[in-house]
C-alpha cells in the first residue's frame, strides 16, 4: 500500500526534536511521498533544509493568505524570487489562496496576491495548492478574472459544500481531504460519498487538524493512514483502493514527484 501526504508542514519547529521518528512512523504507515507547502519568507529556510535531508519530501513555494499583512508586497517578492530562481526545486505553487476566517482587513491584497501566484503557476507549468477559509466567493471571483478554460491544482483541506466541490472539479481542481473527515461531520461524509476517488487527494496539514484518535494533539504525516481508512469506510471500498486511486491522483496532479 502506498500513500501520499499532499500537504504537511513537518518542517515546523514543533517537529525539531523528533523529526526522524516522525519520518519513520510515516514510512511505516505506507507514506511514500510528503509535500511541503510554504507559508512565508521565514518558513523557506526550514522547509528547504528538511527537503534536502529526505529525498521523498517535495517543497512548494507560495505565500499563505494569512501572511498577507502590511508588508505583503515584500513577502510576495521574496517568494517570487525563490520560485523563479529555483523553479526546478518546487513541485507546486503553494500554499496560496484566500482566508477571511479571522480577519478581512487585507481581503483586496489577498485577492491580488492569489491572482499573481495563480499566474506564476501558469507561467511555470506548475500546479497550485489552494487554501480557502470563508472566502469562496472571493476565490471564484479571482479564478473567473483569470479567464482560463481549466486549472491544475488542489483545494487543500476542503471545507466547502458539494456544489462548490463540483464546480471546482469541473474547473480542473482536485479536492484535498484531511483529518476533519474523521470528526463527527456528516456534511463532509456525504460530500465524499458523492465525489469520485479519482478527484480526491489525501493530506494531513500537520501539525494541525490531527485525525481521530489523535484529535487535539500534534498531527503528523503518518496519520494520513487514518484519513484513508475513514474514506474507505465512508465510500464502502477497501483501504487499498483508496490508497491506490488517491496516490495515482496525486502523482498525476504533481508530475514532479512522480
Q: Locations of the language-model features?
A:
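Mid-domain alpha/beta scaffold segments of enzyme catalytic cores
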Residues: 1-258
Amino acid at each position: 500500500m502506498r500513500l501520499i501526504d499532499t500537504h504537511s508542514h513537518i518542517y515546523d519547529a514543533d517537529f525539531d526534536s523528533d523529526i526522524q521518528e516522525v519520518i519513520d512512523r510515516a514510512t511505516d504507515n505506507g507514506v511514500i511521498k510528503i509535500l511541503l507547502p510554504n507559508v512565508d519568507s521565514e518558513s523557506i529556510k526550514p522547509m528547504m533544509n528538511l527537503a534536502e535531508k529526505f529525498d521523498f519530501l517535495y517543497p512548494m513555494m507560495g505565500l499563505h493568505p494569512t501572511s498577507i499583512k502590511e508588508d505583503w508586497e515584500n513577502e510576495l517578492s521574496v517568494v517570487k524570487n525563490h520560485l523563479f530562481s529555483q523553479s526546478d526545486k518546487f513541485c507546486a505553487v503553494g500554499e496560496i489562496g484566500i482566508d477571511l476566517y479571522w480577519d478581512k482587513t487585507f481581503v483586496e491584497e489577498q485577492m491580488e496576491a492569489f491572482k499573481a501566484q495563480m499566474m506564476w503557476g501558469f507561467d511555470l507549468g506548475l500546479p497550485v495548492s489552494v487554501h480557502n477559509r470563508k472566502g469562496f466567493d472571493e476565490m471564484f471571483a479571482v479564478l473567473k478574472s483569470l479567464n482560463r478554460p481549466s486549472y491544475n491544482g488542489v483545494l487543500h483541506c476542503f471545507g466547502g459544500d458539494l456544489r462548490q466541490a463540483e464546480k471546482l472539479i469541473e474547473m480542473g481542481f482536485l479536492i484535498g481531504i484531511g483529518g476533519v473527515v474523521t470528526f463527527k461531520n456528516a456534511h463532509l461524509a456525504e460530500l465524499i460519498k458523492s465525489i469520485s476517488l479519482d478527484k480526491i487527494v489525501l493530506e494531513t496539514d500537520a501539525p494541525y487538524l490531527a485525525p481521530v484518535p489523535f484529535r487535539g494533539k500534534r498531527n503528523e504525516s503518518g496519520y494520513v493512514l487514518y484519513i484513508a481508512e475513514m474514506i474507505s469506510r465512508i465510500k464502502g471500498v477497501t483501504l487499498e483502493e483508496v490508497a491506490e486511486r488517491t496516490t495515482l491522483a496525486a502523482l498525476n496532479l504533481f508530475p514532479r514527484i512522480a
